[in-house]
Structures are given as structure tokens and as C-alpha cells.
Curated annotation (Swiss-Prot):
It comes from the Archaea. GO terms for molecular function: alkylbase DNA N-glycosylase activity; DNA binding. It comes from Methanoculleus marisnigri (strain ATCC 35101 / DSM 1498 / JR1). Keywords: DNA damage, DNA repair, Hydrolase. Belongs to the DNA glycosylase MPG family. InterPro entries: Formyl_transferase-like_C_sf, MPG, MPG_sf. Its EC number is 3.2.2.-. This is Putative 3-methyladenine DNA glycosylase. One of its GO terms (biological process) is base-excision repair.
Amino acid sequence: MTLPAAFYERDTVTVAKDLLGCLLVHREEVTTAGRIVEVEAYLRGDPAAHSYRGTTKRNRVMFGPAGHAYVYRIYGLHTCVNVVTGTEGAGEAVLVRALEPVVGLDLMQARRGTDDPLSLASGPGKLTQALGITMDLNGTSLRDGPLQVRSPANPPELQPENIVQTTRVGITKAADLPLRFYLKGSRYVSRR
């Protein structure tokens, strides 16, 4: 079941933690999906957030309604996918950093050129390549578009002690903020 709009319209840190265990699903000719095991929150006023200096053509989706995909390229190479959160105009989002592959493993392996399930989606660029997420999905609804976030059929009860909170990866601004969250014990995270 896809998540309601109200799920995304909450506090971004709360949404980030609650995304853990959910499924990121890309529906195309062959569906691919993975369980979200690692995320990072980017907040209003956060120097590391794309929204920090205001609205631009590149980041305008971040300022739009919650529950939409903010997809962008980094280094001209890798595509990253974020979940827009909070109130419209806030410029907040959650970066999906890693997935545990669950559906469409063969297609993910072909796209990534590896048979190792642990490295298929263990990073933001890896997971978008594995799921076939492209810039065409920027701004699409995560509730009824081809890219969706769904609650798992039998959601695990995530206790606070099963969520690791630490600093974000690969940034220089606001690098000390503990806004990265991952499932304790998951072998699919990008790094510990």
C-alpha cells in the first residue's frame, strides 16, 4: 500500500526514520523494489541542503508538495533520489541512501553489472541505477506515479534502539549534524 500524503507532511527527521523498512518501488515493464535501510535528512536552513540558498530551477521540486520525488545528478554521473517532506515551501527532503533488494533482482544485477546483492543498492547512485531511476522521475508523485514508497506487507516493529543515528556521508557543510539514519544490523547500508 502506498503511503498517504499526511505521512510525508510531517517533521522531516520523523519521516526519515519512518521511511526505514518501507519499500521503494519502480513500476515499469519489470518492477524493481528494495527495502529502505539507510536515509539522510536535509532540513530548512541546513547548509548541506540543495534548498539552502533558495529556489532554483534545479531544486524547485524540494519546495513543492511533500510526497514527491526530488531526483538530481551529482558529479554529472550519478542520479540520487529524495523524498520531499514537510510543508510546501519548506525545501526539505530525505535522501534515500541504500536499499535491500527485494523484487527484480535479475534486472538490478544486469543494470549494475554485479551479482553481489550486498553492493547492488548500497549507495545513492547504486540504488538509482539498480532500480532504473532517471531524471524523468523528478517531481513525480510517490503515491501514484511509477516510483512509489510503500509500506511493507508485514511491517516490522522498529524500536528506537534498532535505528542508528549518525552524521551524514560525503558532505563538507554541516557534516557534524546527526541526520543519517540506518537499520542496525543491515548488511545493505552504504557504510557503518
